[in-house]
Design a protein with these regions (language model features):
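Active-site-adjacent structural elements that line small-molecule/cofactor binding pockets in enzymes
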Residues: 1-153
Length: 153
């Protein structure tokens, strides 16, 4: 037998960016909304989520927003493009989606993109390790030591 409704209840995360159905359901029920994408995606989809929230009388700030982005350090534009191409091939993404979703470049370029993500209302970032370079631990260590501290409150 299932237990009665628990208080506090486990939080519900809804992932996806479907503008008519998924975001409407997230506006009604989610504690947390997650989608693959960067600043462009989160700004656009976030506006639509806000509209759905208004329709159901919910404060959109009640929903934690998070993004999934692919991390890669690169010293030049060619390196960034290699990371984007790898993402496109592996995930079947087009070039525009890759430019938005891939968090790649120098430390300052990655920080700049994260600042835009934060400005879009994102409060949490997921970095899938299965898409990291061969040196997964090195990339994560570098991210945590050189980038993350600037975004921690």
């Amino acid at each position: 037998m299932p237990k009665p409704v628990q208080k506090p209840h486990p939080e519900l995360m809804i992932g996806g960016g479907g503008e008519k159905v998924t975001l409407r359901i997230a506006a009604q029920h989610a504690d947390h909304w997650n989608v693959w994408g960067g600043p462009e995606t989160l700004t656009h989809k976030g506006r639509i989520l806000d509209e759905h929230c208004a329709k159901v009388g919910r404060d959109p700030k009640q929903i934690l927003r998070s993004a999934v982005m692919v991390l890669g350090f690169a010293d030049d534009r060619a390196g960034v493009e290699r990371i984007q191409q790898s993402y496109m091939k592996r995930m079947g993404a087009d070039e525009a989606k890759a430019r938005d979703t891939v968090l790649a470049g120098s430390v300052s370029q990655i920080r700049d993109k994260l600042a835009k993500l934060q400005a879009a209302g994102v409060g949490m970032l997921f970095i899938p390790t299965f898409l990291l370079p061969t040196d997964r631990h090195g990339a994560l260590d570098r991210f945590m030591s050189e980038i993350a501290p600037a975004f921690r409150s």
